[in-house]
């Protein structure tokens, strides 16, 4: 089980996270309360022993290009309606690994219809990883019936409202390739060592 812990803001948080997780993420050029300056993102990327995703709601090629150049990012996580051509050009120009986020409703009136709509949207993108999320930093679970249907067709990373208490059940229901967490392993807005360790342990020990 691939485990990513997102939204770190300092080298101290990096030290906590990289002991346990497979990847982490830094939020830039976004309205998120976890956003950090590009210079700090670069420092974290340069000091990390695990992949660091540059996470943003940026849309245009020039915005992403500038951020990639200034941080040295090799991994990006796109939380916007960036065009498929933009993703293709970023991959071609910078050789970046792209995780593209897609929003899943919190409550679906028709899970099969929503899953098919998502699969159609996902198919337009040449993404290396697909993230199914409730919405940028919402801290809420999405409708797992939808993500489980999508996960039957393609490998997905699940995010939104995860914590050590629910991650095992979510994995059993959805059967994803991986999970991504941020606020669910924090205390007072800071990544907590015990919560991080417990989340990763539970996620990686699930049998399904």
Swiss-Prot record:
A GO BP term, please?
A: L-tryptophan biosynthetic process
Range of residues in the leader sequence: none
Report the EC number(s), separated by commas if there are several.
Answer: 5.3.1.24
Q: Which GO terms describe its molecular function?
A: phosphoribosylanthranilate isomerase activity
UniProt-listed SUPFAM superfamilies: Ribulose-phoshate binding barrel
Q: Which UniProt keywords apply?
A: Amino-acid biosynthesis, Aromatic amino acid biosynthesis, Isomerase, Tryptophan biosynthesis
Which pathway does this chain act in? Amino-acid biosynthesis; L-tryptophan biosynthesis; L-tryptophan from chorismate: step 3/5
Please write the reaction equations for the catalytic activity of this protein: N-(5-phospho-beta-D-ribosyl)anthranilate = 1-(2-carboxyphenylamino)-1-deoxy-D-ribulose 5-phosphate
Enzyme class comes to: isomerase
Q: Which InterPro entries match?
A: Aldolase_TIM, PRAI_dom, RibuloseP-bd_barrel, TrpF_fam
- Regions that span the bilayer: none
Q: Which domain of life is it from?
A: Archaea
Tell me which PANTHER family the record gives.
Answer: N-(5'-PHOSPHORIBOSYL)ANTHRANILATE ISOMERASE (PTHR42894:SF1)
Family statement drawn from the similarity comment of this UniProt entry: Belongs to the TrpF family.
Question: What's the protein called, per UniProt?
Answer: N-(5'-phosphoribosyl)anthranilate isomerase
């Amino acid at each position: 089980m691939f485990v990513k812990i997102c939204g770190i803001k300092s080298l101290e948080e990096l030290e906590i996270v990289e002991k346990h997780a497979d990847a982490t993420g830094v939020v830039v050029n976004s309205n998120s309360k976890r956003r950090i300056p590009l210079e700090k993102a670069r420092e974290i990327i340069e000091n990390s022993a695990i992949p660091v995703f540059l996470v943003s709601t940026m849309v245009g090629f020039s915005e992403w290009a500038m951020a990639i150049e200034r941080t040295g990012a090799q991994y990006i996580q796109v939380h916007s309606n960036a065009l498929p051509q933009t993703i293709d050009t970023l991959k071609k120009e910078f050789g970046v690994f792209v995780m593209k986020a897609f929003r899943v409703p919190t409550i679906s009136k028709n899970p099969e219809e929503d899953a098919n709509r998502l699969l159609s949207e996902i198919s337009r993108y040449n993404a290396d990883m697909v993230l199914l999320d409730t919405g940028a930093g919402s801290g809420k679970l999405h409708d797992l019936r939808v993500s489980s249907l999508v996960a039957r067709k393609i490998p997905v990373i699940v995010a939104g409202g995860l914590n050590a208490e629910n991650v095992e059940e979510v994995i059993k229901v959805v059967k994803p390739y991986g999970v991504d967490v941020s606020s669910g392993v924090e205390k007072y807005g800071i990544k907590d060592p015990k919560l991080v360790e417990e989340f990763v342990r539970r996620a990686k020990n699930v049998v399904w």
